[in-house]
Design a protein with these regions (language model features):
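SF2 helicase catalytic motif II
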Residues: 46-49, 60-95
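The feature captures the C-terminal accessory region of ATP-dependent helicases
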Residues: 203-231, 235, 241-258, 263, ...
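A short beta-strand element within the Helicase C-terminal
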Residues: 327-343, 349
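Conserved helicase ATPase motor motifs in RecA-like P-loop NTPase domains
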Residues: 77-80, 91-117
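Conserved SF2 helicase motif VI
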Residues: 344-369
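Conserved interdomain linker/interface between the two RecA-like ATPase lobes of SF2 helicase motors
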Residues: 104, 114, 124-243
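Residues immediately C-terminal
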Residues: 47-50, 79-82, 110, 327-328, ...
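Conserved C-terminal RecA-like helicase domain
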Residues: 1-42, 57-59, 64-71, 187-320
Length: 591
């Protein structure tokens, strides 16, 4: 049986002999050996989570074997949604049970999650020690470190949760103190301001949002830019919570005229592009937004010189309109940002992309991050607004959804990780809900991990290992379906066409008869002096890859043209639209 997805390509050319070879030698492709032998394996958590979530079919075996022979590094573990945290705890518990070390890497680790992951790991390690360590003294080796300091080596052995909490609190206290001292020495790089949405009852919420964002973009460019003798430029990030509303607002923005003597260049960045096109966008942004050398932005290869040369206007505003994919994992340096709020965590993480590489020579004269006072769900009058992404749920909610009423000024001016990593000192609520967004998030995390109906703690505090009921009730990535689609091009003279890989039969079959409807947007209304930043025509990108890999255009699509669509509960819409510069999206209800 092939326990590895047939479409998964493994790039590794090192030795493939290992301690488990006698069990894997019958697999002729050696892909399993490659994944087990690679000294460092980099993957998304989706490839590892089957180790504890798989209940049938054998797909969990490879993840289990890899964790049996390796340590585990989790980058941004707190980026997962509330419903996925129990599965994360189960994975850490399993790593402890196998005797693996676990490293948690994040600048925004909330206390509740730190405590839950310690408890789950300790419970697993206790089982490992029982089988492998004679006379274990109940201690677990733990350490904390950041760019300022490391925890005391002498106190590395932790006996129980109380001892862990003491060490963690001391480390967080030292970190917050170091952050404050740094702000005293250097001007804060990221200062927020809550920017009120201008509402008009005669227009849709999306239009009100687009008008406000356009105004914010122009204001931020005026105050935060780079200049030379001929041009004034700025590169900003507009973050929105969900892809379909993001595209709806993008369409409205590109239809608005740019201010006088100004050119606006837009890029829509989210996860619903074929892999090749998303990779192309990310490569472009990675290069241009690496601003460790301030002068590189004016160059042709590393900057925007080519774009500037094609337009005579003096002011050029480059706007990346992004979903939450822009918050983590990208080493980008923007001049400013506009944020549709979802959570305190997303605000802090996104702020880390503003002035990321450069140092300020003087104090900011005005805020460089505008937090919209409401998100689109609030504008539409929905009862639960900070969810998917966010922490609200029917039984745990906020009393208000206007940031001006649920954030204190010191939580966004300046913006740093302090609100996220510091334990809350007081809880304020009224009959309608909690009164502070940051405190509410800490409460929601603790509820999900330790006291909720489907709390994560049940895994290590009880013994549910003999069945898959916990995994069934606490599903990781809780979606109805996840189907693979491919954008294929037969040759350079034919238009791209969507295909569906039917995995419901064996072997899987590629067909043009897709379960969903794909439409192509041919034209868009564009305002004066408004352009798309990059050429994202599939044939251009595919042709370059065909040359690079010496393969045919159709093979490029089959290898790099995948886009997986997850069908979430409550969404019965099966009609999608595709535009080369907007990606795949669905129309939103503009009530």
């Amino acid at each position: 049986q092939d326990i590895l997805d047939a479409e998964l390509y493994v790039d590794y050319s090192g030795p493939t002999s290992h301690s488990l070879s006698k069990w894997t030698k019958y697999h002729k492709t050696k892909r399993i050996d490659k994944l087990l032998c690679a000294p460092v394996l980099v993957s998304t958590i989706d490839h590892l989570i089957p180790a504890t979530e798989g209940t049938k079919g054998g797909k969990q075996i490879l993840a289990m074997l890899r964790l049996l022979t390796a340590d585990l590094v989790l980058d941004e573990p707190d980026d997962l949604g509330l419903s996925d945290l129990p599965a994360l705890c189960r994975l850490v518990n399993w790593a402890g049970m196998l005797g693996s070390k676990v490293l948690l890497s994040t600048a925004t680790m909330p206390p509740a999650l730190a405590y839950a992951l310690y408890e789950s790991y300790r419970a697993g390690w206790a089982q490992y020690a029982k089988a492998n360590l004679d006379g274990w003294n109940q201690n677990v080796c733990c350490t904390w470190f950041d760019e300022f300091t490391t925890s005391d080596y002498k106190n590395r052995f932790i006996f129980d949760l109380a001892g862990y909490k003491n060490q963690h609190r001391q480390f967080v206290k030292n970190r917050i103190s170091a952050l404050k001292k740094e702000q005293e020495k250097k001007p804060p790089k990221r200062v927020g301001e809550i920017f009120s949405i201008q509402k008009c009852d005669e227009t849709s919420p999306e239009k009100n949002l687009a008008n406000t964002i356009h105004q914010a973009v122009c204001i931020l460019h005026k105050h935060h830019h780079e200049r030379n003798d001929e041009k004034i430029i700025s590169i900003g990030l507009v973050r929105m919570a969900n892809i379909n509303p993001l595209i709806a607002v993008t369409k409205l923005l590109i239809a608005m005229d740019a201010p006088e003597d100004t050119c606006i260049h837009y890029c829509a960045y989210h996860s619903r592009y074929p892999l090749a096109i998303r990779s192309h966008i990310e490569n472009k942004l990675d290069t241009i937004l690496n601003r460790k050398d301030k002068s590189s932005i004016w160059e042709t290869e590393k900057g925007v010189a080519d774009t500037l040369a094609g337009h005579p206007q003096k002011n050029h505003i480059f706007v990346v309109l992004a979903s939450p994919v822009a918050e983590v994992g990208r080493d980008h340096d923007y001049d400013w940002a506009v944020v549709e709020p979802s959570s305190m965590r997303s605000i802090i993480q996104l702020a880390g992309r503003v002035v990321r590489h450069r140092e300020l020579s003087e104090q900011l004269k005005s805020p460089n991050i505008f937090l919209l006072n409401e998100n689109l769900k609030a504008l539409k009058g929905q009862r639960i607004c900070f969810e998917r992404p966010g922490f609200e749920m029917p039984r745990l909610g906020l009393a208000n959804h206007d940031l001006k009423k649920i954030l204190d000024i010191d939580q966004y001016n300046p913006i740093d990780s302090t609100p996220r990593i510091e334990e809350i000192k007081e809880i304020q609520k009224n009959p309608n809900g909690y009164l502070n967004l940051n405190a509410f998030e800490h409460i929601a995390l603790a509820w999900q991990l330790f006291s909720g109906d489907k709390k994560a703690k049940v895994w290590w505090a009880n013994t549910p290992y003999w069945c898959g009921e916990v995994q069934r009730q606490q599903r990781f990535r809780d979606s109805i379906d996840d189907e693979p689609y491919y954008l294929l091009i037969e040759n350079e003279y034919q238009n791209p066409r969507w295909h569906w890989l039917n995995e419901n039969q064996y072997p899987p079959v590629m067909t043009t008869e897709t379960p969903v409807t794909f439409n192509t947007l041919q034209t868009l209304e564009m305002g004066d002096n408004v352009h798309f930043w990059f050429d994202l025509a599939p044939v251009t990108i595919y042709s370059q890859l065909a040359d690079d890999f010496a393969i045919e255009l159709r093979d490029v699509g089959q290898r790099f043209g995948e886009l997986r669509i997850a069908e979430y509960s409550g969404n019965d819409n099966q009609e999608y639209w595709y535009h080369k510069n907007l990606g795949l999206h669905q129309e939103v209800n503009k009530r």
